């Protein structure tokens, strides 16, 4: 796997989409890569329109290492559809003052998928910001492992770093193991981490059904709303809507199995 360098002053948005049309395994994950520059300039990978989404495949692996230099920003969005096994390891270093990195991820599993995600976020210098937000849905006999770590060096004062991993279980046979971690060696920081594993709220379902919404539609609404904070990080509106529709279709298939 490769290295992605975000040069000083650049703003980059990277979107990696794993779906069942791709052979995706631990030693050769090949997601579609869709990229756009963020507001403020910078460069990114070639753009793909929503019309390209069902068929366009860019055989670029997600980088294993990302280095963000002074006053640069990177947003990475990782989306994993049902039917995909993958092992994602991402090491991010904020290597210049004023650097920022945001890593977002959403995954939906409904069979016997095995999804592993490991993110290490290194704050080496002062005045840097990072956020990790991963939200997932696990059904069937799927297995999800999430390992996230924030490492704040002694010299990295005025750091702000946040990490969240939230999951919904759809079956008793699905398993989620989540391990958020903090290693802080500086004094003047704002850092937090958290993880949750729960079920769909039946009271919400009852409320929606009392207003004429079917149980299937109620569950779909709950799950799409659950992952929507990740989908909202997709800057291209047409891509966001197309991907949300693809997630909805896959979620309906899982419900109706």
Q: What kind of region is each of these model predictions?
A:
Residues 207-228:
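Extended amphipathic alpha-helical segments enriched in small hydrophobics
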Residues 30-46, 55:
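Short Gly/Ser/Thr- and charged-rich N-terminal loops/segments
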Residues 1-28, 52, 56-206, 210-213, ...:
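Conserved beta-strand/loop scaffold segments within soluble protein domains that form the structured core
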């Amino acid at each position: 796997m490769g290295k992605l360098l975000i040069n000083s002053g650049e703003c980059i948005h990277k979107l990696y989409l794993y779906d069942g049309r791709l052979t995706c395994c631990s030693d050769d994950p090949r997601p579609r890569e869709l990229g756009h520059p963020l507001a403020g300039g910078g460069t990114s990978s070639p753009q793909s329109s929503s019309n390209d989404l069902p068929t366009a495949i860019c055989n670029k692996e997600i980088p294993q290492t990302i280095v963000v230099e002074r006053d640069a920003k990177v947003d990475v969005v990782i989306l994993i559809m049902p039917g995909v096994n993958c092992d994602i390891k991402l090491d991010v270093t904020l290597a210049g003052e004023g650097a920022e990195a945001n890593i977002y991820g959403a995954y939906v599993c409904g069979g016997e998928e095995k999804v592993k995600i490991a993110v290490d976020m290194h704050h080496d210098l002062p005045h840097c910001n990072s956020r990790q937000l991963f939200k997932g849905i696990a059904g069937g006999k799927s297995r999800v492992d999430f390992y996230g770590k924030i490492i704040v060096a002694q010299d990295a004062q005025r750091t702000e770093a946040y990490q969240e991993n939230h999951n919904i279980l759809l079956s008793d046979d699905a398993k989620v193991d989540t391990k958020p971690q903090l290693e802080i060696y500086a004094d003047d920081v704002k850092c937090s981490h958290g993880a949750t594993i729960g079920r769909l709220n039946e009271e919400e379902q009852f409320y929606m059904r009392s207003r004429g919404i079917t149980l299937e539609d109620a569950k779909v609404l709950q799950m799409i709303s659950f992952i929507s904070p990740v989908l909202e990080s997709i800057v291209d509106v047409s891509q966001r809507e197309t991907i949300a529709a693809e997630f909805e279709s896959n979620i309906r298939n899982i419900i109706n199995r």
